[in-house]
Amino acid sequence: MTPDHIAAQDRVVPASDRVLTGPVTLMNSFKVSPGRDEAFHELWARTAKYFTAQPGFISLRLHRAVSADAQYRWVNVANWESEAHFRAAHGTDEFRRVVTQPGWEEFPSSPMLYQVITETS
């Protein structure tokens, strides 16, 4: 069951418990019903154009689960220079327009902001 309407605040990441310094990563998991992948991907691609043009944007990747049984079949991973850049991009009227455009109500998501704690290669 999906809501009849997803408001801009439904796409907003909760505030940090502390002031973050350095790069941050948004991980946003989406529920996409089987057979709706193409519609989701097209909507995501239109929305991505807004974010890639914002100051502080580093990169954006969209992942699809290899199992059709996954609860969240698509995951968006976006890297930003700082939390301040991320918040600025997510605080505009254009952001609110982009994330409430028709179609998004079909794809509920669970966005959260992260920082790298340990990295190995």
Where are these regions (language model features)?
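Residue-level signal for secondary-structure boundary sites
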Residues: 36-38, 84-86, 119
